[in-house]
């Protein structure tokens, strides 16, 4: 697992894939910049298709609403040999962490 603060540090690395496991509606309302939306409830169905395109040497960072779904998905992916991190506390902890002085500099996209 990683903290909300560490998410930005990992984002700067070359081979990082950030995956939002929330619903498409939640994703459209607010998501981490550059994150791919892969809803947790559809994860089993499309997991293999997505994983075909993600190199095992890359790092996947998963987040959800509060951190529980991303932790479960991370465990499954690690069993398959992928490098995976889960954001503790999910998007709510990240967006409420006051990591930036100005909303312009935030990696969170809010479409309201």
Q: Where are these predicted regions, by residue range?
A:
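Rhodanese-like catalytic fold shared by cysteine-dependent sulfurtransferases
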Residues: 1-10, 16, 24-59, 65-112
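Active-site flanking residues adjacent to catalytic metal/cofactor-binding acidic residues
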Residues: 19
């Amino acid at each position: 697992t990683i903290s909300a603060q560490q998410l930005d540090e990992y984002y700067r690395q070359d081979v990082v894939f950030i995956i939002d496991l929330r619903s498409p509606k939640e994703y459209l309302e607010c998501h981490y910049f550059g994150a791919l939306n892969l809803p947790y409830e559809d994860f089993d169905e499309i997991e293999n298709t997505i994983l075909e395109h993600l190199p095992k040497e890359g790092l996947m960072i998963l987040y959800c609403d509060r951190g529980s779904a991303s932790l479960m998905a991370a465990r499954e992916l690690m069993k398959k040999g992928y490098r995976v991190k889960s954001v503790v506390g999910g998007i709510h902890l990240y967006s409420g962490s006051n990591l930036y002085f100005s909303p312009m500099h935030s990696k969170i996209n809010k479409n309201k």
